[in-house]
Amino acid sequence: MNSLIVATLLLILIGFAYQVGWSRSRQVAPAGGRLHSRPNYHGARVAIWALVPALLILGLWAFFSDAASRAFVMAQLPSDVRAMGGSELAQALSRIEQIATGFGVVGEPAPYESAAGQALREFRNLAFALVVAAAAGTGALGLYLARRRIAPRLRARDEVERVVRYLLIACSVVAILTTIGIVASLLTEALRFFTFVSPIDFFFGTVWNPRFSTVGAGTGEYGLLPLLWGTVMIASIAMLVSLPIGLMTAVYLTQYARPNIRNAVKPVVEVLAGIPTIVYGFFALVTVGPFLAGIGDLVGLDIRATSALTAGIVMGIMIIPFISSLSDDIIRQVPRAMRDGSLGLGATQSETIRRVILPAALPGIVGAFLLAVSRAIGETMIVVLAAGNSPYLRLNPGEPVSTVTVTIVNQLTGDTDFASPQSLVAFALGLTLFLMTLILNVVALFIVRRYREQYE
Amino acid sequence: MNNEHAEVMEMHMPTEKIVGQTDLYSIKSSTVRTPDAMPRPIRVKAREVNVFYGSKQALFDVSIDVPERAVTAFIGPSGCGKSTFLRCFNRMNDTIEGSKVTGRIELDGADIYDGSIDVVELRARIGMVFQKPNPFPKSIYENVAYGPRIHGLASAKGDLDRIVETSLQKAGLWNEVKDRLHEPGTGLSGGQQQRLCIARAIAVSPEVILMDEPCSALDPIATAKVEELIDELRENYTIVIVTHSMQQAARVSQRTAMFHLGYLVEEGPTDKMFTNPEEKRTQDYITGRFG
């Protein structure tokens, strides 16, 4: 309700300020002469000058209101309650909060609670009115000052453009700050984990046996290598499946297919990319796994239904559209002149593709490959369902394995105590995963960028 | 000629005497070699060639003879069908979606659109140089060796080296690149790249070389070098060149064919075309009245 009122007031302020700026600039326009900026820029400039101070006041209040309310409530409380401290005080404060918001409390409120709650509500209403008045006042002041400066030579357009630029910078900063925040939280939690287990044991340990914290004391063993091996094995199988199929699909679609076939096939291939990974997961579990196990029986190999092979193959299928549409774009960027030059020398179509088009597109394809690998490494749902969750170092892809992502899921689902190494290890694993995909992405971007320069 | 053309001719019909002709002639006479006196045997013969892109007809009933070891130039305003016609000679139009060619084109008496003709072999006999230099993103050596490799022309490494060297020599590029054969071909200047493309075409020992505006992306100095090269190459090769520049046609060719709106307007010895054309439209185009 309150925020609705504030938003409405702000909108009115913006509209009014814009109007004021617009009409004032028309007034000051010299007869027959010209304003430096058109009236709509003057309007926008005044609106910005009115809006920014008002928003600042509101932002400050949003930032400090909790601390202010708390200080106010504490001042209302009898000294014995204030002296309680700890969880009892916190409980009292939350009861008062609930009384103040009209939410109600369990049981009969103590007289001091009701009084404090009532006072808090009044305090808040008053504070809100004051803040809105202050915001409106500063907004009006900003508007007035901005209006006074309007003159024919005032460079309102430049000012507005500058503000637009700051706005855009602010938006992109949000993404960057989020990334930094995620990395920071991963890092701090991972560091907490490393107070329990030494990084050497973690990164070079070959046994993964964390034991559940509920079972009893003892921290267990946290060797990363079995998980890393599982991840690498499944990602490798996935790439072995997806790279040839995806690349050849792209070659067919760009070089051989007639437009009507291309228009029909391309969307169908891309539908694969839209299937939720959990669906791939049970496709692997229910169909591919038993099928592979059956084939294994036929040829005398012991292949388990849930294994690195099952998960890898299905993940490969999932990545095909990723590879094919990236390679498609890259192959199309190879100039037609290359192709004509080769065909004009009497090369066949497949010679042209093999000897000219693919080599020319190679850096881009490598970039696409690395991006796909980082997807394969981070993929979770398929491996949770189909890889068998068995964190042992095994060479045979027909055996179940576990991966970094699966282990993170295992460690963080169910009852978790975020102070135990059993949970904290998830952050160390996440950090490892993040670093791996980060490096792959950086390398991929570097390669793709170098490739782009080649034909410009 | 049909009505449509009569109209176009009227539109551009000059009423006063031709101007600019003497200028053009002075350019030509100062640079070109003595034209052939002897008639040469016919190498490529085209009869009533029509080209369609989808439902649109780009070329109408074009018939022409291309003499051996001479330069034949195709001139005409943009969109007149000269490049389209050139691309019929090595069937490069096949690579364009929805294109259709009718009529006959004979190379040494055999119809190149006959089902028994192998396009790969045909393109080895009729080389092509494109408008924009298009070296492959490989080394200079590999660019020239590309054709011989795919056609298996060199059995030993030494043979390939020799082919690369002679091709680059014939293209007048050897001295400029002999010390950096293994650097990328894309690192050369525009004019050098175009001569590299010519060397690449020569390396498969073609009989005919098609050039599609080979100098349009080059500066005047590089253009002069390529023109000089074309003049040398006609000792051994039959060359067909499409050009926008009438001076270029006058400088390098022995025969000229003028195209307009998909029709062959006129064709004959270059000297005659530039001094005494039969068709008014040729005269108008040559003197810069349209196009």
UniProtKB/Swiss-Prot annotation, chain B:
Coarse class of the protein's main subcellular location: membrane
CDD domains: ABC_PstB_phosphate_transporter
GO molecular function, one term: ATP hydrolysis activity
Cellular component terms per the entry's GO annotation: plasma membrane
Subcellular location per the Swiss-Prot or TrEMBL entry: Cell inner membrane
UniProt-listed Gene3D superfamilies: P-loop containing nucleotide triphosphate hydrolases
Membrane topology type: Peripheral membrane protein
Keywords recorded for this protein, A-Z: ATP-binding, Cell inner membrane, Cell membrane, Membrane, Nucleotide-binding, Phosphate transport, Translocase, Transport
Residues annotated for ATP binding in this entry: G76, P77, S78, G79, C80, G81, K82, S83
Swiss-Prot/TrEMBL catalytic activity: phosphate(out) + ATP + H2O = ADP + 2 phosphate(in) + H(+)
GO biological process: phosphate ion transmembrane transport
Chain ranges of the ABC transporter domain: 44-286
UniProt xrefs under InterPro entries: AAA+_ATPase, ABC_transporter-like_ATP-bd, ABC_transporter-like_CS, P-loop_NTPase, PstB-like
EC numbers: 7.3.2.1
Assembly mode: The complex is composed of two ATP-binding proteins (PstB), two transmembrane proteins (PstC and PstA) and a solute-binding protein (PstS).
Stated family: Belongs to the ABC transporter superfamily. Phosphate importer (TC 3.A.1.7) family.
Stated role: Part of the ABC transporter complex PstSACB involved in phosphate import. Responsible for energy coupling to the transport system.
Protein name, as recorded: Phosphate import ATP-binding protein PstB
